Structures are given as C-alpha cells and as structure tokens.
Curated annotation (Swiss-Prot):
It is an enzyme of class 2 (transferase). It catalyses: guanosine(46) in tRNA + S-adenosyl-L-methionine = N(7)-methylguanosine(46) in tRNA + S-adenosyl-L-homocysteine. Pathway: tRNA modification; N(7)-methylguanine-tRNA biosynthesis. It comes from Pasteurella multocida (strain Pm70). S-adenosyl-L-methionine binds at E86, E111, D138, D161. This is tRNA (guanine-N(7)-)-methyltransferase. Its EC number is 2.1.1.33. Substrate binds at K165, D197, T234, K235, F236, E237. The keyword Methyltransferase applies. Belongs to the class I-like SAM-binding methyltransferase superfamily. TrmB family. The active site is at D161. PANTHER family: 3-DEOXY-D-MANNO-OCTULOSONIC-ACID TRANSFERASE/TRNA GUANINE-N 7 - -METHYLTRANSFERASE (PTHR23417), PENTACOTRIPEPTIDE-REPEAT REGION OF PRORP DOMAIN-CONTAINING PROTEIN (PTHR23417:SF14). GO terms for cellular component: tRNA methyltransferase complex. Keywords: Methyltransferase, S-adenosyl-L-methionine, Transferase, tRNA processing.
Length: 255
C-alpha cells in the first residue's frame, strides 16, 4: 500500500497518530496508582519519511498495542521460544541485531520515542527479522496489564536515563517495585541484564538488585560483569567511551 499519493498527503497517518498518544503513569512503592509522570524525557521528535513509512507499512506485523489482558506469546510469535523483553531500545539497532543472532529466542521491545520505533522496524524489515515485536507505550502499564507472571525468559535494560540530579533519582526506572515486578514476570532461570555508563546509577542498580528476593548475581565479584559478547556495542556505550565514562553490566538470574 502506498502512502505517498496526493489524497493521503494531508491526512494523519498511523505513525502520526501514534506519536501523539504515548501515555505514562506513576505508582507508589506499594503498586498503587499515583499520577501521570515520566521516567524518561518524552522526545517524540519528528518522524522522517523513512521511519513513518516503516511504521505505516509494517506495524501490522511488528507492532503490539496495550491491552487489558496478558499477551498470548505462542500465538503472537508462532512458537514457544522464550521471550526476552527490552525496555527503552533507542533506535533499535542492537535489539534487531540480537534478534537476528538468536533465532531461538523471541524479542519484545518497548520504546516510547516514535522515531526510534520507526527506525527499529525499518532495520528489522531490512534484516528480515521475524522473532521481534514492538510496543510504543509506557513500560509500567505494559508490565502491569499485558505480561503474565512467569512468562518472560529475560529482561534487558541498556543505558536508561540516569536522571543525574539527586532530586530526580525517584524518576529512575530501576526501583525496588520495578525489580520486584520484573522478577514476578520471569520464569525460573530467567535473567535480568542491565547496563549503564553512569557509575552512580550502576551503584544504584546494584543496591536495588542486591535487595531483591529470588535473584542471584552471576558476577564472580558479586557486583558487575564485563560486557558479554552477546550484547552489541551500542551508540550510548560508544558515547560513554568518548566521554571517558566506564560501562557497568549487571546480570542476575531468577532462582
């Protein structure tokens, strides 16, 4: 289907509408609804025609919408392979590369920035990746409403917004309630893999994960691991190296 004819030029496309409908919420430590807030800066940005066309033409295959019941992963992917969730995949190149390199896994990416969603879908189409689905919605609501307990094989969180100022640390996505929720969603033996190029956030992640029940740190030194070969080098990591930052990976297994 073409989206370039004159009749459709002035009409809002699916991608245009999606860019304006991302909603997020905040919950208390006990899990009760509190108010709308963001653990990220909502940079919807301007979709390029390339990104817009990718969303308009391929969302039907790659896209999943928020719903009020758990996703049926075997029906969605057509198999019973483990599902790895990545929250905040940016432009999606590393996520697509991991899906391409690991056909025995299914990947589910959540990203609220629509240019990144469009870029990820375009790259997935280019590479012919079929074991990947994308959600453009707040991760908190997806975890609450759409992901059944004990249904995920892993969680990836690479270079989330560190919220540098102390008064903004409460906005960091890695909080005890978040980790507890993820742990509930994991199958036994499932993993949590986080990475950051901000040492203070790495220490925060480590403290939160250490306090969580039912998780085991795979680090021989009980803190961080070297970047594993299976995690692609991201543009954020390259930026960190240029700025002289270290990079800290954390890898935990659900017992």
């Amino acid at each position: 289907m073409s989206f370039n004819n004159q009749e459709s030029e002035n009409l809002p496309t699916f991608a245009d509408q999606k860019r304006k409908t991302v909603e997020v919420a905040e919950f208390t430590a006990e899990g009760r609804y509190k108010r709308k807030v963001r653990s990220f800066v909502l940079r919807t940005g301007r979709l390029s025609e390339f990104q817009k066309n990718a969303m308009n033409q391929h969302w039907g295959f790659y896209g999943l919408e928020h719903q009020n019941q758990p996703f049926d992963f075997p029906a969605i992917y057509g198999n019973n392979n483990p599902v790895v969730l990545e929250i905040g995949f940016g432009m999606g190149h590393s996520l697509v590369d991991m899906a391409l390199q690991n056909p025995e896994r299914n990947y589910l990416g959540i990203e609220v920035h629509t240019p990144g969603v469009g870029a990820c879908i375009a790259y997935a189409v280019e590479k012919g990746v079929k074991n990947l689905r994308i959600i453009c919605h707040d991760a908190t609501e997806i975890l609450r409403d759409c992901i059944a307990d004990h249904s995920l094989g892993g969680l990836q969180l690479f270079f989330p917004d560190p919220w540098h100022k102390a008064k903004h640390h409460k906005r960091r996505i890695v909080q005890p309630q978040f980790v507890n929720t993820i742990t509930q969603k994991l199958t036994t033996g499932g993993f949590i893999h986080m990475a950051t190029d901000w040492e203070n956030y790495a220490e925060h992640m480590l403290a939160v994960l250490q306090q969580a029940e039912g998780l085991q740190n795979t680090s021989a030194t009980h803190d961080y691991i070297p970047r594993p070969d299976f995690r692609p080098l991201t543009k954020f990591e390259q930026r960190g190296h240029r700025l002289g930052h270290g990079v800290w990976d954390l890898y935990y297994i659900k017992k």
